[in-house]
Amino acid sequence: MPAISNLMRLTSLTITPHTPWNVDCQVAPFPPRWLAALRDAYHRRPEIKPDWSLPTRGLVELLTGLDPAIVNVSSNPASGRFIVALPPGADTTVLAAAVAAWATTEVTPEGCDTDWWALCQPCDLHFHTETINLLDYHVRPNGTAAGASQMFTLLPSFLAQHVVTAKLPLGGRARDWILGPPQRDGRRSAVLWPPERLESARAGDALVTAKITFHVETVPNHPLPHVHADLSTSRFPLMPVAYVPARGDGPPQATIWLHAPDGFLREHEPHTLLAAAAWRAFDRASRTRQWQWKPGLATTLAWLTHLPFPNPEKVFTDPAAAADEGKIRAYYLYSEGSKSLAGDIDDLDELAAIAAGEETGKARTLLHPANTGFVPKDHIEAHEQLAAALAPVGIGMLEPCERVGKRNQRKVKPAETPGQSYTLELWTQSALTREALLAALEQHHQLTPVPDPADPTVITFTGELNLRVILKDAGALGAGIDRPDGDRQPEATLLGAYANQVAQRIGQSPGPRAAILELEDGRYFSRIRKIDPKPALKKAFARTDRRLQCLRPAKLFTPPANPPKSARKKPPAPYPGTGFTVGSILRASAAINDALRQLGHLSTYETPDTLPDLEHIGIWLHRSGNTCIPIVIRLNPSGPATAYLASADGTPMPPLPYSDLPKALATGKGRIPGGKNQEGQVARFLTNALGVGHDTHDRVVFVRSSSFRTRGWDWLQDKHIYPDRLILPGIELDDATATPRVFSPQEWPGLRIVRVRERSGTDEVARGFAADHETTSVRISGLFQFSDRVFYSINPRSDQMQTPLGATKLDPDILSNFTRQAANPRPLEIYPVFLQPKDDPAAYATLASGLRRTYLHTEQATVFPAPLHLCELADEYL
């Protein structure tokens, strides 16, 4: 077995200090005459408000994709650097026509008295040469790198182009890449192209490819920008798509990639991909819902190009033909929950029924044969190849981070307070799931059942805790919510009405209880075309003083027809003492634990000897539209957990037991409505949570960075944060403003603040693997130190991550590996930013890392430390 490394390397790249990457670019401003006419025409539309900006998103995507010479288009037409192109520059005739088409379709879609084609003349676009340093940056007063705007808007495209031109090798051979669709935030991908075809008798044929996405990030108080290059997959079904689930209250939407092998406007132009949005909107002519292009890139491009443009309806009814025929190929970007036609794709009657939105009787879940994720070997190879290819321009690897403490450092074990008593209701539809839950209590939790002789629906379990279990019939509670024909109410309205119905049916609980409800998952309701009732059920149960946990139906164990013959591998067997699968019992146990967690069944633990006895405080800011919901949870080693919510008018609210938090949130408490007073109320609430001016006891506050990325507590942002120099919430730290009041640890005795930042959907934190992976195990876990105050915590590999380490997806000769699911623990950035004198930053980073694995309700390590994890879980009641 390979040794475990003590060195971790992040997969992001950095730049060599003061090494320029100068490129000569052609730069053009937006013609003032065009801009004045466009603004005037746009604001003459009655539905457009005076302060609304021009809808430039489609224009940015269109111009960037039409001419591969263009590397950036600003979303602000008033910018002096509106278009940036490579020499010898872009085709002004194409650009002028594109602006005219965009103005016609998006600025004045109903027509106006301006002839945009006559107004937008190529001679109005004036390009001039400008030398731009792509690696230009400076260092802020707090020591954090501040990249120039071109690092975020231009550099990713140049890096992606570098990969395409160099045919970046992977798997020991040069590969063909194409520029991915441009993105509004400046990110750009290099995509392996064409995609690979996978054949599957179960899921149908499909396409899959890998891509590397470039973006620039910073690390607090670190003087160099980091270049992230994230490896991921893109999947495209070839089976007819009958149904795409809606996300939110609007109609179903989808992303379609477009590729013109011979160019969108001119033959032999360099290849690039475009991404267009489609939605299933009501068609007045046919009186049915059909797939249509959303206003934006697709509608403008269809107006502009001379090539036959894809019909979005055909992209869904016959994806294989759309991806293989025509001058413009279209690829539906796979979305979980989509529904497919299981019959023959040549069945014209079936296809017509799908196009009309009718039930066909053959639709089933559309499973893509390819699974997401890559093994560590793939991430490391992409990282090493990029570092070698980009070294000539001054971009290379980061130095390894050293492990903090011992590799086998003792885990903080949670302890259970003995003698606790709870009431648990089991709402089941089948006797099978009910028996699985009772078996989990007896066999997995080692509790002793004692039936109530007076009531057959009540069973008391005794042991480490006392549990009164009440059996309930769920009936049709979990059957799903129907949407009547022609009903266009928002989904939120239907969920709200159903929550009221359920609350009325189940009635008020006589006291605080936990509940488990047998319920299918979201994919099931997508298949049967009903609305998933889970959000409504959570609120209805909470309002009646029940904390709800949902559980999918249990399964009996069935012996395999062909058991494994290996003597080293145990044959499959049911969970000991039961007839159920191991997975069913473990899922039932997890549901029990999480239901009890909501009743306040939380762990206690001893504070490490190196730290004082600390109160642990989590601060989280939820947002719902314009409404803010700040939540504070306090875990006191010597007392019960408490929660704090804000009031709508700013009046302080008394603390409430953690177990009462679900009911409070479900009944609408804790909301701060939008308006001029909102930011001040949020700031006062957060300041009170810190204990300013009245608390002196030892406490550590955990705060999530992304909760305050744009507002609420500017000091937590990378560009403002500074060790042990605290600035209160609610103060806008504009670079031009005077420095506000700064507080030192001596002024606030006992207070510590730890900021954490997760990888999240924006990939703000890079992945991390063993730096010396050639001689040690490539996977790594523990706490690693990046700088004096910045650490990275990596959880151990979970039991579900069983994909062999050698299952590469970057070898085109082994496509079967794409069918494997791969995942790797993601580093959590930990920054002990405000500490008391003589505190050791590593000790508080170690505490934060250990609190990711200190629970009674789950054996899985969580993304956040316990106080923040509990705050995050409250989201299900909002």
Language model region names:
Residues P2-P295, D318-P319, Q446-P533, K539-L878:
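Long, contiguous domain-sized segments
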Residues T272-I531:
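Long, charge-dense tracts
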Residues A436-A440, A536, R684:
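Long, highly charged amphipathic alpha-helices
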